[in-house]
Amino acid sequence: MDQFRPSRFEVLPLVVKNLLIINGLVFLGSLAYENFYHSDLSDLLALRYITSPDFKPYQLITHMFMHANFMHLFSNMFSLWMFGSVLENVWGPKRFLIFYMICGLGGALCHMVATGFELHQMDVAFKFFLSHPDQEQFMVLLKKYPPPYELSTALNGVTNIHEAIHFTMQLYRVYENTGAVGASGAVF
């Protein structure tokens, strides 16, 4: 097996430097995209669950370079520099890049499995509610699966059981379409 023997320890090795640049450019691009199009780039590039209508295969890669905010980007890039530099200096650029990509894809796989498990449990609870729709079951469902902010205002308009059924279907779609950003395991 070929071993990489660096001639010296580099503080900012090639792959780490390029990953820092790519992540920074994607973050700046997402800010520009948001200002220009008044839409969030993570709607396209964040990882969606495989049954989501918004899922695209390229998201398995692009989610690794998306970050929710500056502190998310900073903490991930600081960790990448701190730990990635050591690993790249020991392993070499090729092995480190392979490791980074495998960890990112592994994070995507773990996210898909965990999301699938959670959605299956939600599906069982929602189907139970739909087969026994009443106010008490609706409240139990909301306690177990609280609606995210974007649906919380719609909850105020639920006045009868038919609206509650419609709301639960919306809630399931929101959970199914929630995206993952920020390496999902590539650094940690």
Residue ranges and their predicted role:
Residues 1-188:
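A detector for small-residue-rich transmembrane helices and their helix-helix packing motifs
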